[in-house]
Amino acid sequence: MPSVRSIAWALGGIAAATGLARLAREIFAVDEQPLATAGHVESAGATEATKTFAAAGSTPDQVGIPFAVTRAAAVEPHAEGREFYPRLLEDIAAASSSVHSLMFGWKPGTVGAAVSKVLLDRLADGVEVRVLVDSFGSRPYGSSKQMYTELADGGADIVVNDLLPPDRRGRYPDGVARWPMSTIGRSDHRKLYVIDGHTMWTGGAGIEDHFENGEFHDVMVRLQGDVVRQAQSAFLTSFAAQGGPLSDDLDAYFPEPADGGAIECRIGQVVPGGHISATHAARELIDGASDRLDIMNPYLTDADVISRIAAAAGRGVRVRVVVSERSNNFRASAALKHHYRRLLDAGVEIWEYPGAVVHAKVIIADDRVQFGTLNLDA
């Protein structure tokens, strides 16, 4: 009878097995009508899309820009914070024009202090630093306020994705907080860095100590090539939609890469307001797998996704699912274990990662891979 197994190898083993021959679903991926943007399709597309978005005074609900397939020249997966944080800090320290960070969770601590210090150093040398953080994940009005105040005092432009309207700190005279449900709870879970317009980082990790000290197991990926222009557009449109200032010369943010690359990839967005094309892309990957399907995700609870995983195993695909032996979310863990018998009976291999909390979000389907910040929850 099939059973749940314990696993003791790192994500790097899975990533290396793909060879990253085709990065067909980079970060999130999209559906809808794709915009011909950076790279071999239309080199000026990302710049023009950003200008159009900014000129229209678009809102956060409109930042789900669909991008076309483009190319990457270099794709470097890094597992564990002790590996990816030093490399990320090197890239930031080498920045000569701009550092842009879109971050769900950025809190004080050893890692937070290290990132803040290098950003303050860059600011002192005249490098532009722009930051978009989530109010729930980063606590900029609470425990993290001093850190963000220091960055702002150093010259950083910081805007916040608020889960509540601007009147969050007070109530109206009649004592009723008029917070429409349509504007509450729209957390921005993305994690993205764009450095000098030619290097980007994305993945599941925030700027928090538990990613560095071994408590959480995660992966970040460094990319260069044409795809970075799409990432830059994603950041700038989100930053502007939240009220961040944009310069008149946006062209400077989209330099022509020395090597556009040959690895097919595409950026999509999962943004507050209902743009969930990443989930659609994940389903397409699962449904399209013909030989192997490897999934590592911390909160695998979506019933539809689970049905698709079971169906893949049923049609002869070797399916391996890696989850936490010890999750940081007992409700999500209980919900997944409720489906264990169904998955096992379908032929799915379930591997429980011991010790650290699995926080990486990776799907490998044959020779295609999706990575980034997408949780496969309901």
What residues fall within each predicted segment?
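N-terminal Lys/Arg-rich, disordered targeting/topogenic segments
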Residues: 1-3
